[in-house]
């Protein structure tokens, strides 16, 4: 049977044009970009072309783009690099309670090294406000980090407003845009971002490659030491095929952004409407207003989300119960508990994230099969609980 893949927030398939762009850089143009011979120079040209493609998508200079191994490295680099580079000013950082663990765990590591971190709460839809940030700012605050879009519930944070506030107050502002790039329009100038993280595998590029935008003039210490790659900011021989794939993927994502967003918004709303009509006691997590166009997150009273996942998988449907980075954890989602769900409600959650290949037939098949799965599991739970 044809499988239906609705876990695109975890990762996406490499598109055919991206794969075709990458292939020559495995066996034909395979030189080290730091080498001065022609094969190395050809590799260097490919790296710089990809850098321009990323810069074009973000509205910045190519010299402000640095390639990394992905979103987690970019987030680690921002927090540790900015913290150590600006510790003479202070050791206070502001973030939110619903950030990706690449942010939260790095902040916890910094706390163990003597930094202080304020974790802002969010409302029932997952929003933080610029006013909250302003209230938390101190004279020793060196960095504010707020994600552009939440990876679990799809909430689009008011990052432009927060960025403007940070600039006005002379505090560095970073946004983790891993889920947002390729899904919504982004411009670093409009966002007032000093730094921005992204990862190729979230928009049909390869895994293991990402980038960090660092505004010209912003001081940040390196995370990885060694050679002089990435203008001395990030050591290590460049992942040439990956960089080429990232460049092509972000170029294609930007070209089809408006069309894909409109189509996925329609399909997302169709999915939510269908499930709402067919499944009683189902909660939609997050807002319907300012939400990623491909994100659906729901909770079912009385059953475990993991059980729903297993049954869906048997039916040929791939989904998730939250962030792929926390799969296997016995703890409920920190995002869902932060927006007010109980542990049981959070454990009964299901995340369905659409992709560019998702069809209306896929959505209708999920609406057809999921209500029966939920009803069956609820019946089993009720039977097992009888005294």
Q: Residue locations for each model-derived region?
A:
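Pyridoxal 5′-phosphate
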Residues: 1-387
